[in-house]
Amino acid sequence: MASGWWLVVLAGCGRYRDFTLPQQPGGPSVTWKWQARPDPVLTRDAAGEWDAVDVLNPSVIRQGDAYYNFFSGYDGKAWHTGLAVSGDGITWHKEAKILSPDPGTWEGSSIAANGSAITDESGILYYYQAGDPPQIGLARSRNGHQWQRNGTPVLTRGPYGSWDERGLGDPYVIRFGRGYYMFYLGMDRARRQSLGVAASDDGVSWYKLRGNPILAPGAYGTFDANGVGEPAVWASRGYYWMLFTGRDGGEMRRLALARSRDGVHWDKLPMVIAGDQPWDSKVICDPSVIVNGNRVTVWFGGGDVAHPAQNIHGQIGLGELLSAPH
């Protein structure tokens, strides 16, 4: 991880600013190789359970000697967040459902999931999608089992005419130095889905980049022509890297890679990753990464039905990106 703090230019006031992440030095070109286990590592439960229809959106962190996976489960009516624990990141034990949407609050009744977990001095912070229109909430925990919600969204949709006026989703939060950064999906009036970034001093009060979006859908006929989403960001080998999901015109979903030196200006790379097993033949999405040297472990969602949301027979797989200089 880079040291230091973000560069901020106060070009105005309110909840928008100009900033970058700490500058990365760059370096030699890097070749990435993808390999994945053939079978899912976290599967749907039996009919009638809270995660019987889809299991997607892993967010994996280390807690001592264990891996904690905060994943999303769909029961046919609503999305919930559950916790699974593993000693090796491969064999998982489902602990419990930990968050469900609260209809008596801003969250509504359809979703409290699609989240991103990180740790700081206060414990575990879990940023999740909820509400209609969708926005980003925050829950905190000391142990991963008992949670306290923030009460109001920490990141809200943009004003009329903005790139994210219809709603937000797919948060992915990282820390560099003293800063928190959230990469997220925004949807405009035409329902185009792009990616943006926000920054925070404390993980609670956020301001959006004035120049959002930072990653847009591709041209007609490309793998991401229908939208981009579900980012996962890390730093290694002199750059920031982003795995993201692209949706094509037939709603097939694939993963792709982008690169940046400042976390704001991104270049899409040629690498596109498609599912190659029957269970993820139509959709591969929702990456969550842990970096260990030249090896990036990637938990991801997959399905065998081409659909932009749920009912894809979703399950969670495990892969690796291995890097080497040219």
Give short role names for the model-derived ranges.
Residues 1-11:
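Sec-dependent bacterial lipoprotein signal peptides
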Residues 12-326:
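Carbohydrate-active catalytic/glycan-binding domains of CAZyme proteins
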